């Protein structure tokens, strides 16, 4: 978990970015002093150097992005469309699977002492 010193520097950097001010060690120190937080002297310089060549706006926007989404199932390549007779059979299979899964969800494994 982040320490108070780290959080103070992070919030200072976010405030500076929000005000469209360049993030520097001196400006981080000024905000931390104004907030009345005591921070080890190396933290503001560390954050200023780490954020010097980083686009903070894109960093904020991509925080939750875990990478590209998996591709959807491919469409059948060329050829005729599947027959309509096969579609109802597939629907019955899907319904049967849904019923089975609902039954298994209702059980929840409490039958051990029945």
From Swiss-Prot:
It comes from Mus musculus. InterPro entries: P1/P2_N_sf, Ribosomal_P1/P2. Residues 69-88 have a biased composition (Low complexity). This is Large ribosomal subunit protein P1. Belongs to the eukaryotic ribosomal protein P1/P2 family. Ubiquitinated at Lys-92 and Lys-93 by RNF14 and RNF25 in response to ribosome collisions (ribosome stalling). Residues 89-100 have a biased composition (Basic and acidic residues). The lineage of its organism: Eukaryota, Metazoa, Chordata, Craniata, Vertebrata. The keyword Acetylation applies. GO terms for molecular function: structural constituent of ribosome. GO terms for biological process: cytoplasmic translation; regulation of translation; translational elongation. The modification N-acetylalanine is found at residue 2.
């Amino acid at each position: 978990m982040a320490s108070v010193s780290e959080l103070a520097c992070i919030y200072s950097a976010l405030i500076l970015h929000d005000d469209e001010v360049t993030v520097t060690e001196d400006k981080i120190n000024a905000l931390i002093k104004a907030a009345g937080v005591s921070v080890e002297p190396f933290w503001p310089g560390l954050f200023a150097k780490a954020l010097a060549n980083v686009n903070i706006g894109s960093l904020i926007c991509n925080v939750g992005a875990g990478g590209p989404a998996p591709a959807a199932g491919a469409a059948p390549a060329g050829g005729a469309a599947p027959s309509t007779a096969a579609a109802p059979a597939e629907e019955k299979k899907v319904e049967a699977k849904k019923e089975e899964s609902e039954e298994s969800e209702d059980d929840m494994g409490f039958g051990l002492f029945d």
